[in-house]
Amino acid sequence: MTGAAAGMRAACAPILLIAAMALPLAATAQPAPNADPAFPFAREVEAFARANASGPALRDATLFIGSSSIRLWDIKGSFAPIATVNRGFGGATTPDVLRHYDRLLPPAPPRAVVVYVGENDLAGGASPQDVARDLNMLLRRLRADYPRARIACLSLKPSPIRWTLWPKMAQVNRIVATRAGALRVDMIDVGTVLLAPDGLPDASLFNPDGLHMNPAGYRRWTRLVTGWLRQDDAKPANFPIDPKSSNIITDRKTVKTGQGDLG
């Protein structure tokens, strides 16, 4: 071996050693087989699909579907003895729910459906018009699949950390509310109950992250949704709604509106 060749081999040795050491690290860094690099919550959706395939089908349950505001809600405890199915997953956008729609739905048709999604869409840069379009697409699909179920869409909520997005959220709420009646969907205003007397989000109702609600905030949502579910006992599942208006349910009353603001 020439002196030049020996010198080159000596110079390359540290590089080869580093590369060899990096191989095990690279192997451990590989994503799980069911992980989608563009969708970090694939495991949650996979768990829903397994539950659908193996678990008992709950008849006449209330399906809650959407993002982390649904996932973090103690739905089973909050609405007992009503049978419930929680299909919320963290960080979900409306396109995510539409993409995984078939894997999220329970095997038995629900008696009622409660939807909350769209907030993360806006946080990701989507326009209010696009969010409302996707949300209406989801509501239309749910209505087509469950023609006799009652469906409620929860208005996008204000929060301390996303307060700058509130004007866009209110715009989404207005657009969806004006079109909900034709789909026989009730719009429940869950935002007003989270505001303090000064009109700003009440920080005492949120976790330290300023985004997700604490138990006190969820109790306010539970009261509203419980009131809506109790209406189900007095009306048939396919009760008629004026297609020119929508039901906006607030903490105080139900308002019929055609162009109303959720406030």
Regions found by a protein language model. Name each.
Residues D36-F39, I82-P95, A123, G210:
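Acidic/histidine-rich helix-loop elements
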Residues Y146-R150:
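A short helix->loop->beta-strand "cap" motif at the edges of active sites that frequently abuts
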Residues M1-F64, I75-S78, R230-G263:
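N-terminal secretory targeting modules
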Residues P128-M137, K168-N173:
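Charged helix-capping and loop-helix junction motifs
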Residues I70-A83, T94-A132, A152, L156-P160:
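Oxyanion-hole/transition-state-stabilizing segment in secreted/luminal serine hydrolases
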